Each structure stands twice: as structure tokens, then as C-alpha cells.
């Protein structure tokens, strides 16, 4: 199990897997710290068979890969992302380098690369370079516009304040994805407020016209 961050919606599922303990958890030291203190999932799971979880540290931006023994045909690389820490965290609005990561998965046999980015607040140069090398991009499509949550009276914050670059606009992700010729582009982490979820909308049709896909439950991806 790889945790890219310690957001509640990304980590709470571990509790549903409690009867399968112990689990091998791969995450940064920053995420592990939060999951043992302010959101203590790791401590809670110690009460189940096998001692709960075993932590393996991920070091972002390392020049060497990390491997997972049960997946010997693949190697993994972690990249720090500028996004945000969870609302419960003391590091909210002042995230550390290891609070959010993207992960590249490489098939050793084919050389194909998948880059997984569930939260993007800023597009740094090292992230753009990695995106350009990927064969498949799985990246966040949380919001269509930056003020979507404000206009819908769901929040008082812009998407970028929450750590999410919107899809639309001059500085949106669509503009960036249009510059990348190599990868297949698939959106994940799509908020319920995002109009692209409705196939009858102009926003959905515009997205598809740019060659960008929307992920779905049960989707199978090979590299």
C-alpha cells in the first residue's frame, strides 16, 4: 500500500482492511508521522492480528528507485509535490516537502512509465519533466474552475488554496496537458462539483476534445 499523502479520503480505507493485517505501508516520514499522531490510523491498527502495519520510508526526489517485493517487475520513483496538508494537520497552509508526493511506476520489462499525481497545487519544473516522460498520466482533475467551490457555496477557498490547480483557464491543467504529446492523460480525484462528470455538459465535451479521459470504477490500465 502506497500513501501519497495523509488526506482522510486517501487513507481511511486502511481501516476497512483491518482484518487483513499486517499491511506493508510505503509513505514518507512526514505522512507516517501524521498517521501515528494527529490522525493515528497506524496506532489503531496495532490492535489487529499481526501487529497492524509495517512502515517502509519513501524518500522523495531520490535519484534511486524504491521497490516493492510483491511487485518485482516494477520500480517506483517518488517526487515531491507542492500541494497542501490536510485540514486536521498542524502543517495546513504550510506543508513540508514530504507531505505530498507523486509516484512514477516503471515496468522493468517494457520500460513503460505511469505517473500518478493525486494532488497538484503548483507545477514545478521537475514535475513537468516527469510528466513529459510518462506513457500514462493519472492526475487530479478536482475542479473545473478555481472558484468553483466558492460559487457553489461549498467553501470560502479557491482551489489553488486547497492545493488543486483547476482544469480550465489560462493557467489551468488543460493548457499544460495540451503541450504533452507522449502520454495518455487520465483524470482522477474529481470533485462532485466538477461539471465534467456530466457527459451532457459543454465542459465535458471540451475536455474530451483535448484528448483527456476521465477515470471510472473498475478501469484497467497496463504499462
Predicted regions and their residues:
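Acidic/polar short surface loop at catalytic or gating sites that assists cofactor/ion binding
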Residues: 21-24, 31-66, 82
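Cap/insert and terminal regions of metallo-dependent hydrolase folds
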Residues: 98-100, 108-113, 120-219
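Short internal beta-strands
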Residues: 23-31, 138, 187-188
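Active-site metal-binding motif and surrounding structural segment of the metallo-beta-lactamase
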Residues: 1-27
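Core dinuclear metal-dependent hydrolase active-site scaffold
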Residues: 57-130, 217-223
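Generic structural signal for residues in well-ordered beta-strands
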Residues: 52-55, 76, 212
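Hydrophobic packing residues within well-ordered alpha-helices of enzyme cores
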Residues: 11-17, 35-38, 127
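Short, charged/polar "capping" segments at the starts of alpha-helices
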Residues: 31-36, 64, 146, 193-197, ...
Amino acid at each position: 500500500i502506497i500513501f501519497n499523502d495523509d488526506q482522510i479520503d486517501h487513507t481511511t480505507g486502511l481501516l476497512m482492511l483491518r482484518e487483513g493485517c499486517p499491511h506493508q505501508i510505503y509513505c514518507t516520514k512526514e505522512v507516517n508521522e501524521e498517521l501515528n499522531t494527529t490522525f493515528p490510523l497506524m496506532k489503531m491498527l496495532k490492535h489487529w492480528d499481526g501487529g497492524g502495519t509495517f512502515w517502509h520510508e519513501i524518500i522523495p526526489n531520490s535519484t534511486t528507485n524504491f521497490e516493492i517485493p510483491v511487485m518485482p517487475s516494477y520500480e517506483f520513483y517518488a517526487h515531491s509535490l507542492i500541494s497542501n496538508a490536510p485540514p486536521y494537520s498542524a502543517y495546513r497552509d504550510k506543508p513540508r516537502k514530504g507531505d505530498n508526493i507523486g509516484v512514477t511506476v516503471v515496468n522493468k520489462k517494457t520500460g513503460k512509465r505511469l505517473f500518478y499525481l493525486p494532488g497538484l497545487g503548483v507545477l514545478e519544473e521537475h514535475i513537468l519533466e516527469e510528466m513529459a516522460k510518462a506513457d500514462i498520466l493519472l492526475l487530479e482533475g478536482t475542479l473545473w474552475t478555481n472558484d468553483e467551490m466558492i460559487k457553489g457555496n461549498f467553501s470560502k477557498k479557491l482551489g489553488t488554496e486547497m492545493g488543486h490547480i483547476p482544469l480550465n483557464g489560462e493557467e489551468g491543467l488543460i493548457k499544460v496537458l495540451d503541450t504533452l504529446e507522449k502520454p495518455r492523460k487520465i483524470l482522477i480525484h474529481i470533485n462532485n462539483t466538477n461539471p465534467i462528470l456530466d457527459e451532457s455538459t459543454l465542459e465535458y465535451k471540451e475536455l474530451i476534445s483535448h484528448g483527456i479521459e476521465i477515470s471510472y470504477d473498475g478501469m484497467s490500465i497496463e504499462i
